[in-house]
């Protein structure tokens, strides 16, 4: 993968930086693993906006991703790497020895023709999935489960990874990219290696329209609104809002703590760093 800067032939291309990946499949995705993905425009069943800044965008199918990796002991071969419009990471179509095909998140360095496997006896190599109880301390992993059998929930986006710091009986200690150190059950599964397409964070869309293609609408500042629309609205001339930053509903924002799940606080060894 490489970054490509464009010549400034127009205002929209002047700041455009694209991620070029010649290894991705050029054709259509694997149809049996596609599902309809209807757009809501941010509206609920009453037609009211429940999520702002959503609307428009290109039609997409949802790719069914195997986040559980439960086909233990059956070797698989990577058929191809594909683009997925629903996530920042690329995905890989793998063919198992029993004839079944599944999509997985493509780890860094994975390419067509590579062999992967899952299960407690899987070799220690990138792309293989196994319980963290069976992984060496210090391993870099992604697609990490929080509960055994629930499916991966942590480190699924492009370039993400988690490091196994220690193993102590029933739990392993993980260091997340945010700096948080937390404990997870040792029987939870993870995939070795880090997620590929790390250059995704270095791209530049170049123009506002590129965000509209992705279904993202503009964000209007509260201080530019009227008092009826936002707590920061109104005033004569340009103002700073006149109070600490809040959401349109008066909730503190920009740094206010939002974590409410005290039940799982006991698993957090060290809180994340800013």
From Swiss-Prot:
<feature type="region of interest" description="Disordered">
    <location>
        <begin position="223"/>
        <end position="274"/>
    </location>
</feature>
<dbReference type="GO" id="GO:0016740">
    <property type="term" value="F:transferase activity"/>
</dbReference>
<dbReference type="InterPro" id="IPR014722">
    <property type="entry name" value="Rib_uL2_dom2"/>
</dbReference>
<dbReference type="InterPro" id="IPR022666">
    <property type="entry name" value="Ribosomal_uL2_RNA-bd_dom"/>
</dbReference>
<dbReference type="InterPro" id="IPR008991">
    <property type="entry name" value="Translation_prot_SH3-like_sf"/>
</dbReference>
<protein>
    <recommendedName>
        <fullName>Large ribosomal subunit protein uL2</fullName>
    </recommendedName>
</protein>
<dbReference type="InterPro" id="IPR012340">
    <property type="entry name" value="NA-bd_OB-fold"/>
</dbReference>
<dbReference type="GO" id="GO:0002181">
    <property type="term" value="P:cytoplasmic translation"/>
</dbReference>
<dbReference type="InterPro" id="IPR014726">
    <property type="entry name" value="Ribosomal_uL2_dom3"/>
</dbReference>
<feature type="compositionally biased region" description="Basic residues">
    <location>
        <begin position="254"/>
        <end position="274"/>
    </location>
</feature>
<dbReference type="GO" id="GO:0015934">
    <property type="term" value="C:large ribosomal subunit"/>
</dbReference>
<dbReference type="Pfam" id="PF00181">
    <property type="entry name" value="Ribosomal_L2"/>
</dbReference>
<dbReference type="Pfam" id="PF03947">
    <property type="entry name" value="Ribosomal_L2_C"/>
</dbReference>
<keyword id="KW-0699">rRNA-binding</keyword>
<dbReference type="GO" id="GO:0019843">
    <property type="term" value="F:rRNA binding"/>
</dbReference>
<dbReference type="InterPro" id="IPR022671">
    <property type="entry name" value="Ribosomal_uL2_CS"/>
</dbReference>
<comment type="similarity">
    <text>Belongs to the universal ribosomal protein uL2 family.</text>
</comment>
<comment type="function">
    <text>One of the primary rRNA binding proteins. Required for association of the 30S and 50S subunits to form the 70S ribosome, for tRNA binding and peptide bond formation. It has been suggested to have peptidyltransferase activity; this is somewhat controversial. Makes several contacts with the 16S rRNA in the 70S ribosome.</text>
</comment>
<feature type="compositionally biased region" description="Low complexity">
    <location>
        <begin position="39"/>
        <end position="48"/>
    </location>
</feature>
<dbReference type="InterPro" id="IPR005880">
    <property type="entry name" value="Ribosomal_uL2_bac/org-type"/>
</dbReference>
<keyword id="KW-0689">Ribosomal protein</keyword>
<dbReference type="GO" id="GO:0003735">
    <property type="term" value="F:structural constituent of ribosome"/>
</dbReference>
<keyword id="KW-0694">RNA-binding</keyword>
<keyword id="KW-0687">Ribonucleoprotein</keyword>
<dbReference type="InterPro" id="IPR022669">
    <property type="entry name" value="Ribosomal_uL2_C"/>
</dbReference>
<comment type="subunit">
    <text>Part of the 50S ribosomal subunit. Forms a bridge to the 30S subunit in the 70S ribosome.</text>
</comment>
<dbReference type="InterPro" id="IPR002171">
    <property type="entry name" value="Ribosomal_uL2"/>
</dbReference>
<feature type="region of interest" description="Disordered">
    <location>
        <begin position="28"/>
        <end position="53"/>
    </location>
</feature>
């Amino acid at each position: 993968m490489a970054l490509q800067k464009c010549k400034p032939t127009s205002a929209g291309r002047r700041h455009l930086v694209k991620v070029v990946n010649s290894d991705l499949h050029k054709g259509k995705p694997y149809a049996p693993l596609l599902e309809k993905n209807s757009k809501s425009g941010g509206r609920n069943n009453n037609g009211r906006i429940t999520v702002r800044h959503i609307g428009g965008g290109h039609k997409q199918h949802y790719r069914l991703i195997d986040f559980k990796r439960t086909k233990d002991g059956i070797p698989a071969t990577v058929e191809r790497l594909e683009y997925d419009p629903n996530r920042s990471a690329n995905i890989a179509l793998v063919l198992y020895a029993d004839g079944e095909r599944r999509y997985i998140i493509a780890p860094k360095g994975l390419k067509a023709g590579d062999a992967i496997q899952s299960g407690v006896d899987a070799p220690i190599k990138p792309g293989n999935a196994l319980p963290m109880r069976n992984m060496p301390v210090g391993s870099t992993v992604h697609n990490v489960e929080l509960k055994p059998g629930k499916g991966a929930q942590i480190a699924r986006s492009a370039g993400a990874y988690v490091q196994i710091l220690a193993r102590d009986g029933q739990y392993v200690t993980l260091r997340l990219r945010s700096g948080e150190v937390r404990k997870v059950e040792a029987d939870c599964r993870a995939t070795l290696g880090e997620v590929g397409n790390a250059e995704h964070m270095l791209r530049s869309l170049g123009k506002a329209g590129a965000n509209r293609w992705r279904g993202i609408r503009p964000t209007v500042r509260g201080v530019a609104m009227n008092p009826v629309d936002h707590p920061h609205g109104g005033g004569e001339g340009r103002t700073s809002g006149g109070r600490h930053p809040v959401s349109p509903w008066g909730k503190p924002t920009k740094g206010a703590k939002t974590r409410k799940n005290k039940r799982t606080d006991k698993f957090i060894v060290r809180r994340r760093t800013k």
